[in-house]
Amino acid sequence: MKTSSLRGRGGAGFPTGLKWSFMPRQFPGQKYLVCNTDEGEPGTFKDRDIIRYNPHALIEGMAIGAYAMGITVGYNYIHGEIWADYDRFEEAIDEARAAGMLGDRILGTDFSFSAARIPWLRRLHLRRRDCPVGVTGRQKKGQPRFKPPFPASFGLYGKPTTINNTETFAAVPFVLNMGGEKYAALGKPNNGGTKIFFDVGRRCQARQL
């Protein structure tokens, strides 16, 4: 993941491999993986469309991340205005379980991972990716908080937690399929891979970023 130069696709652009390395390897208790599909920015629907049209890329990316960090439980935090896509994500989870890609002893290995969506809440614009942890796990208001502690040491239910955006997790299977170096070559220096953009409203021209 570090070789791929994949950065978080939720806005902050933090290096994904570096973030994953913060998860304590020898922690004796439960650890959690959280996907942030709240997507509250106006005119942004990329995460919704990933769940709608390619949910298995997201689920596979979460499972790969969980395997890399030794995590067995994951949640997808989805905001409450895309009810139809809840059902699509649940269907994809059931399909992945039936195919042996989720649940106990995935593909006959010793690795087990379960994923579920967090029950819907009214829509919030989550400016910090650890806000879903605050809203759902600590029963507090969804607002930025002083750090430390960081989610990797004190996150969901007070346990080590890694949080990534939907698009970030959906890119992970492509990193493994292509290899880190080839994936990195698709993007800019220190910012590998491709990026999804939504073009909305009235526009006159597009320019290269």
Regions found by a protein language model. Name each.
Residues S4, G11-P28, R48-N54, F174-A185:
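Conserved alpha/beta core surface patches that mediate binding of polyanionic ligands
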Residues T3-F22, E41, G65, W120-V133, ...:
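Conserved phosphate/anionic-ligand binding catalytic regions in large, soluble enzymes, centered on
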Residues V73-G80:
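Short internal beta-strands
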Residues P55-A68:
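Histidine-anchored nucleotide/phosphate-binding helix
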Residues F27-N36:
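Short coil-to-beta-strand
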Residues E41-K46, Q205-Q208:
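Short small-residue beta-strand/loop micro-motif enriched in glycine and branched aliphatics
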Residues T37-P42, Y67-I71, R202:
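Short connector loops/turns at beta-strand edges and beta->alpha or beta->beta junctions
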